[in-house]
Structures are given as C-alpha cells and as structure tokens.
C-alpha cells in the first residue's frame, strides 16, 4: 500500500519492511521448534520432567537427625575408642554418624550416637560388635562338693539361672579332690564378674549353713541314755498319726537335688524302724524352738494357762522329756489306764521332731501354744535297706544285741552326722487308729543306705552289720561292698523323694532317677492335721478367731475364761 507512495521509494521504508519480515520469520521458527520439542518429549516419556521435580523436592527436604543414647561399661571404653580414638573415627567415617562419650557413674559411660536414622543404626551395630570382641576370660573356682551338687541339682535350675543372668559358660566337675568340686567360668570380663558374684553369694550361704550346723552340733546334748533307748523304743507304741509327713520346707528345697542327704539318727526301734532328722537350717530352728518351749513351760504360771483336761488321740501337745527335763512337741497316740493305778490314765506320746515315744502322766503334758505349730515336724521314719534280722523265723523281730549295735554305729540321739541315700521303699502299714489323712493313705517308707563319714572314707553301716553278724543280707544277691563304699554324688534320690502315685509291691527297689513324691498330697495331709489342732484351740477360745487375738492384750477376764475352758493362749507371743 505504501509502495506506490512517495514514502515507499525511500530507504526507510525498505529498512522497516526488512526488520518486520525477519521478526515474523523468527517468531514462526520459534513456534515450530517449540511444538516439535514438546511432541518429541511426549513420545519419549513425558513423565521424566515430573520425576526430576520430585527428586529436587526430596533433595531439598533432608532426613531428620536423631540421637541414640546407650550405656557402656568403663571396661569396654578402650575397645570402643581404640588407640588414640581411631575406632570411633573409623566408625564415624563409615556411617557419617557422630559419637560422643560422657560420664554416667563410676562404672559406666553414656555413648551418644547422633545422625540420620540409618547412620545411627549402623554406628550402633559397629559399636556392639566392638564390645562383643572383648577378650575371653577363664576362671576356675574350688567349692565344696555339696555346694556344687546343689548348684547342679534340681534339674540344673540354679545353674541355668546363673548362666542366663551372666551369659557366661559354666562347667561343673564333681570329681574333685579333698571333697572339692571345680567350677569353670568362661566369658568376657563382665560376664565372668556377674557369674562370680552369684557363685560367691551361694558360697557365703553355704558357709553360713555350715556354721549353723557346727553350732547345733556343739550345743545339742544327748537326748536319751543308751541304756534306756532300747526299752523306750521297743516297748512304746510309736504309731504316730502324723509322723508320715516330712518337713515341707526342706522337702520343697531339696526335691530333685540329686545328692545324698546329711542326717542325724534321732531315734531307733530297730534297724528296720528308725527316725532321722535332715540336717539343714531347720535344725537350728528346732533347737531354738525347744529352748523357747522349755523356758515357757518351766513356769508354773504358764503351765496353768495350758492345762490339758480333755486330751484326744491325734492331738499335738507339749510334753516334758524326763531324761533331759526339756519340753518338746508330741502327738497323743493312745490314752490308757495306768496298769499300776487303774484310776489314773497314762498317755502314749510320740515326739514328732525326734521319733521316739514315751508313756507319760497327763500332769506332765500341756496344751501346745499355737505359735509352736509353725515349724514342720522334723522326724522322718526310715528303714535300713538290704538287711533283715538274724532271727530266721521272725525276720521283722530283731535281737536286742543287733539293735544295740545299730544304735552304737549310728550314735543315736548323740547328733553324729551321717550320709543317707534312698535306694528303695515299702508300703507303710496302715494304722488302725489313724485320724490323719497321711496315715490313712499309708504313705511309703523310704529304705536308705547309711554311711558314716569317718577317716576320709564313708563306711556302709548295713555292710558293717552284716559282716559283724548282727544282720543278714536281704537276699543272696546282695553284694557286701567294701567298708569304705561311698554313695554316688550323682544320685537323684533324697529321703523325701518317694513315689506314691503308682501301685507297688510291698518292697520295690527303684533306680534313683525314678524316685519322686506327690508333694501336694503330703502337704495337704499335714495342713489338715495342723488345721485340726487350730480348730480345737479356737473352740477353746470361745469361737474367737485365733488370728485376731493379741495375747499381750488379753484381759484378766479373758484369761480367767481361758483357764476355765482350758484355752490354749499365748503370753507375749503371737498365734499363727
């Protein structure tokens, strides 16, 4: 349009037209290439730009740092640090975590690990690995064999407890010398220290027990004279209604210990009918109780509070023993007329903690103070295994000479320590006058081998009886062993471990591994018998609850009523 005008012929017009055409061409080229690039990116995967954007977003949002605090023993700090801190530096370089140690207490330090979670986790794993490569320590201890047997017994419960608590390896060698066993502890220093501490506690407990037993042996006096022991044991009835129940605390503690038991022979009727006390903490408790009973019942005023006016068979009472003038717990087995004075009565008593019996006048018997029932009865009836009487026609009747020899060898009631091991059992004769559940059930009697630990050897008492002509072997196959025969320390039987669940013949030998006991039935029988005593005493207290009675706060009226009703009250001691 401007081309035909005078302006169209000017150079300015031509310049403007050239710039315009170039600009239009450039714009068209840009639009073309832009469209082509978009189409190519769409064909080759148009999601790539979005991925790139997400990656940039994640990189812009770093992980949050965390700090983990662990506690390490001072003895492990050198392992973590390394020479000049080289270990920590190496771990920090590998994991990009930061590690700092600071004091916690005298024996430990805090180890703070900071960084991103993955780095902290990796650093912790490397630190634990360094701690676990602590040098292995081996320690050997010499302990008494009885303690080693205790640790290794009861299915190894105590041994497993030490292993699990310390994470150390423990091995026990019972075949040591001079009555010692060797315990080997293997682990790092911390594990060994923990195991050693737990073993030291057991050693201290065992030494305390030995000291207590030595004190008992020094303080105990002979309970009866040898000249009187035969008559008393042979001619008193000794058919206790409750003596079949072993002391439950000792039974539960030693069940399955797998070792011979230390015992005192406390009373003897014959080699096939005698009583033992298990040596242990209860021995000292028994002596303390006898001392307290003697002190209490020696007072005429106290005896007046516990007058026995209506005795009954099966009642647990307090009675004075004429030989030593001490007071003991006893059970009334029978009440009968005095053969020298039919108008008077005589009471046949079984001393539940010792096993012997006496005929005693009711005047020398009192009702038992209730708190004296707390300790379990200590006498355990046994028979000597593998022997029989020299009287062929009456194998259960023993000559007085044989009984006297057996009393001499066992030092009955003179508190000589013997070793007993259960090797068999037989059914107990059922008592026709029994009122306790245990007697009605006819619990089995343990047959034991007795050993005298003298002159660094253990003499088998049954063998001595046979070789000296005071007994015969139970059968021809019985081997008379050396006089220094030693009971196996690996035996799994104890005096308490009797099997009452399976039918048996009257005399059934069993391997030590098969000996066990129905604890619940025996415990229930003894509890029922004690409950009967408490029920009787509660009735005497006019229906008052024994548990709620404070003897120190009884009024004069209460005491007067108690005496009128023969109540069994306590003076200055709590009833249980």
Swiss-Prot record:
The UniProt GO MF terms for this protein read: RNA binding
> Taking every annotated instance into account, which residue ranges of this chain make up the domain Tudor?
310-375
What changes when the gene is disrupted? RNAi-mediated knockdown does not produce a visible phenotype. However, fertility is reduced with egg-laying decreased by 30%. AGO3 protein levels are decreased and AGO3 is delocalized from the nuage. No effect on nuage morphology and no mislocalization of piwi and aub. RNAi-mediated knockdown in germline tissues results in delocalization of AGO3 from the nuage.
Q: What is the effect of changing residue 328 to A?
A: Significant decrease in binding to unmethylated piwi
Query: What are the Low complexity biased-composition ranges?
Result: 232-243, 561-576
Q: What is its main location?
A: cytoplasm
Q: Where in the cell is it found?
A: Cytoplasm; Nucleus; Cytoplasm, Cytoplasmic ribonucleoprotein granule
What information about domains appears in the record's comments?
A: The Tudor domain is sufficient for binding to the N-terminus (1-14) of both unmethylated piwi or piwi symmetrically dimethylated at 'Arg-10'. However, it may not be sufficient for binding to symmetrically dimethylated AGO3, instead this interaction may require a larger region of the C-terminus which includes the Tudor domain (257-576).
| Chain's role | Involved in the piwi-interacting RNA (piRNA) metabolic process, which mediates the repression of transposable elements during meiosis by forming complexes composed of piRNAs and Piwi proteins, and governs the methylation and subsequent repression of transposons which is essential for germline integrity. Likely to act by recruiting Piwi proteins such as AGO3 and piwi to the piRNA biogenesis machinery in the nuage. Required for the final steps of primary piRNA biogenesis by participating in the 3' end-trimming of piwi-bound intermediates into mature piRNAs.
User: What is the protein's given name?
Assistant: Tudor and KH domain-containing protein homolog
Name its species. Answer: Drosophila melanogaster (Fruit fly)
Task: Identify the gene encoding this protein.
Answer: papi
